[in-house]
Amino acid sequence: MKTSIIKRNLKTIGKTWFIFMGSIFSALSVILSFISWEDIGISKTCNKILGYIIIIVVTLIVAIIWICVFKQENTIWENGSGKIAVRYDDIMKIAFPKKYKKNKIVVIPVNTCFDTQVDEDIAKCDKPLVSPKTIHGRWIKNMIASGISKEDIDSCIDEYMNFKGINPIKTLSNTEKSRGKIKCYENGTIVVLEGQNGITYFLMALSEFDENNKAQSSKESIVECLKKLLDFYDGNGQGFEIFITLMGTGLSRSGMSHEEALQTIKSVFQLYSDSIHGEFNIIIYHKDKGKVSIFD
């Protein structure tokens, strides 16, 4: 177990430790009201003290293991049918289940052009487009692996745009963008695609590619996108459970840390909680436990 994970959760470990320890000592006091230490063969004071120390140490170890290993979800707000929870998981496993369990919505942050070209062999392309390491890129690769071609994805996106009357805010020239799609849509634009086994994808325009096809976003634009997501979900979510990853970290270049990204999402969701009539899950990649705590 990494020490960084323990450090991130010290406050919660401490609270849990006191709860566990209090419960054990309360139970012990009840037991000792019926029998004495001597009845169970403990008569020396040093042995009694040792017994208390063992309880303290064991409950601390149990608290650390419980919080850092087994506790994977933390509910931060709940009211009626509305709920906001933070959990460790892999958004791709949620987005591509092997069998149907229940209807779910998975939010996939994409660029404002809704590009679907994932460039892995950077030696053979000028100004690579979607990185395979982003949620956007991983989603496209998983879609293709599940039997849906890039052309089919493009077709579904275009059909939804036409059906909803969503128009681009600008069209780039070949000089501005030599590869990929050239129609740019407003930040926060959402395209709905049906997946398999009860999964619906909300593709949300979050980052804008610059002249070198590098994704760019800001904290302010992310906040606006989150507001639009809540409004869109209120009218189109059908109360389905929804999953969203941390936005603004990594290759989106907003400059936010994992902790700042989590606090931003939590703040927006709690501020506009009147729009939440379903279960909202903020997903932190399980390998990022050392970077941010679900209890922050």
PLM features: residue spans?
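Macrodomain-like recognition of ADP-ribose-binding/processing modules
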Residues: 1-296
